[in-house]
Design a protein with these regions (language model features):
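ATP/NTP phosphate-donor binding region
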Residues: 2-69, 76, 80, 112-119
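Catalytic core of DAGKc-family lipid kinases
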Residues: 18, 41, 48, 87-88, ...
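Cofactor-binding loop segments of dinucleotide-utilizing enzymes, especially the Rossmann-like FAD-
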Residues: 20-22, 50, 94, 239-241, ...
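Short N-terminal binding/cap micro-motifs at the start of the first secondary-structure element
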Residues: 24-28, 218-219, 311-313
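Short amphipathic alpha-helical segments
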Residues: 29-31, 78-82, 102-104, 154, ...
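Short conserved active-site loop signatures built around small residues
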Residues: 72, 209
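Glycine-rich phosphate/pyrophosphate-binding beta-alpha loops
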Residues: 145, 149, 210-224, 287
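ATP/nucleoside-binding phosphotransfer catalytic cores, i.e., glycine-rich phosphate-binding loops
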Residues: 197-198, 203, 222-223, 228-317
Length: 317
């Protein structure tokens, strides 16, 4: 990603801060502390908790930057609301995985360092995916997928994440989900999928299919190391039954804290079409459908394309 500068350095910036107060741990700054850090960096700030029912209305107010403090869930919600509005987004990573912030190179910096870096006004362009199907149309920031990861998300959500409730540390939660994925992989039955990518038929039996806008999915799992969120292309990860061992090794490396560079099949493209016949799909961190009976199980087409440079994110120097 090649950063570019916006605005003039000497101007005081007006920051709208959207904060998820449930994100982070005991060491994470509170809302008041975040406001103080932003003030001390020389900016004006308007605070909004994402727990307020009408928090989205704050995004209609004029500002120079929308800062988002929390995890990928709230970052994605804000980003989808700002598509095509050309308002820069500043991510403050305080979640479990922080995949978007990791993509932007922010997870190796402290929160005060990230906020201090805003004065440089460095932006990068960021694509969004668009998935049209039985749910109408939805944009995604991280990715869309089906198979092992999606089914595991669905099971965890159905149990209200009780398998992770005893864990307070974000890193422990990430490792626990990776271990659950690795265990489920041993007995997972591949899905038969009818797929075309830019007109090429790639139908087959797949353990996992992930349509990725960034390199990471879920628990910091790097499946598409060469994904670039501003190149106008999607990275589609195909894991067939024959590649089960490769995915298992990737999960094992991630559990051990190694920088996984999986030798999985990844294809780049602009348009993917999948015939949906009732299997579970995830769109970013949401599992669809909530109620399978809401849609007919006769085949429906999922059409996935790219909206190029529809968002801008701040990065640190």
């Amino acid at each position: 990603m090649v950063p570019f500068i916006f605005g003039r350095h000497h101007q005081v910036m007006r920051i709208t801060l959207i904060h998820n107060p449930d994100a982070g741990d005991d060491q994470s700054p509170s809302g008041d502390e975040l406001v103080g850090l932003i003030h001390r960096a020389g900016h004006a700030v308007a605070y909004q908790s994402s727990k307020d029912e009408n928090w989205r209305s704050r995004l209609e107010e004029s500002c120079d930057i929308v800062a988002v403090a929390g995890g990928d869930g709230i970052v994605g919600q804000v980003a989808k609301h700002l598509i095509d509005r050309h308002i820069p987004i500043a991510a403050i990573p305080m979640g479990t995985a922080n995949n978007v912030a990791r993509t932007l190179g922010l997870t190796n910096k402290t929160i005060p360092q990230i906020i201090a870096g805003w004065k440089e006004r460095l932006l990068v362009n960021f694509d969004a995916g668009l998935a049209s199907g039985p749910w109408d149309s939805k944009c995604f920031i991280e990715g869309l997928g089906m198979g092992l990861f999606t089914e595991t998300m669905y099971r965890l959500d159905a149990r209200d994440n009780v398998d992770l409730a005893h864990l307070n540390d974000s890193e422990e939660k990430v490792v626990s989900v990776l271990q659950i994925l690795k265990e489920r992989l041993r007995t997972f039955t591949p899905n038969k999928l009818k797929i075309t990518l830019d007109g090429q038929d790639l139908s087959g039996q797949y353990i996992l299919l992930e349509v990725m806008n960034i390199s990471y999915v879920g628990p910091n799992l790097c499946l598409a190391p060469h994904a670039h969120p501003g190149d106008g292309l999607l990275d589609i990860v195909f894991v067939s039954a024959d590649e089960q061992d490769k995915l298992s090794m990737c999960l094992a490396d991630s559990i051990d804290g190694k920088l996984a560079r999986p030798a999985l099949t990844v294809r780049k493209g602009q348009r993917l079409q999948i015939e949906w016949d009732g299997f579970t799909v995830h769109i970013d961190d949401e599992v669809w459908p909530d109620n399978a009976s809401a849609f007919p199980l006769s085949p429906n087409l999922i059409d996935i394309t790219v909206k190029r440079h529809t968002l801008q994110f701040l990065v640190s120097p």
